[in-house]
Amino acid sequence: MVKIRLTRLGRHKLPFFRIVVIDSRARRDGAYIEKVGTYEPFEGVVNINEEIALSWLKKGAQPSDTVKNLLREQGVWKKFMDSKVQSKKEHNANKVKKEVKKPEAKKAAASKPASKPSASKSASQKKTVSKK
């Protein structure tokens, strides 16, 4: 699984973080796939490349809790969720169009055999009457 998380840089008691896409099994400061941005906690500066972050989120990368908060602050998470909702609406609209076409064919096929069972019902009614 691929995650978006922080890797620590900087010196003692003055941290600096890179926001990176990394395999979930890799070490905290291990080799990463791609750099998404940076975070300086003491200065409160966050730099995120939105295009790269959105592309990895759409591919299924899971952000850590801290990174998710940073993405929310920058507005990237909202863009991702909006695009996700929009794609679901489009998918559901296409699904409804396909379902509308199928029942028409089923109704036509269902109406033909319906006449045959009605004759068998009348025969079964006659049998029950004769038993009384």
Curated annotation (Swiss-Prot):
Keywords, sorted A to Z: Ribonucleoprotein, Ribosomal protein
A single MF term (Gene Ontology): structural constituent of ribosome
Keyword presence, Chaperone: no
Tagged with keyword Ribosomal protein: yes
UniProt xrefs under PROSITE patterns: RIBOSOMAL_S16
One BP annotation, GO: translation
Comp. bias regions, Low complexity: 108-132
Protein name, per record: Small ribosomal subunit protein bS16
Gene source species: Malacoplasma penetrans (strain HF-2) (Mycoplasma penetrans)
Lineage, opening ranks: Bacteria, Bacillati, Mycoplasmatota, Mycoplasmoidales, Mycoplasmoidaceae
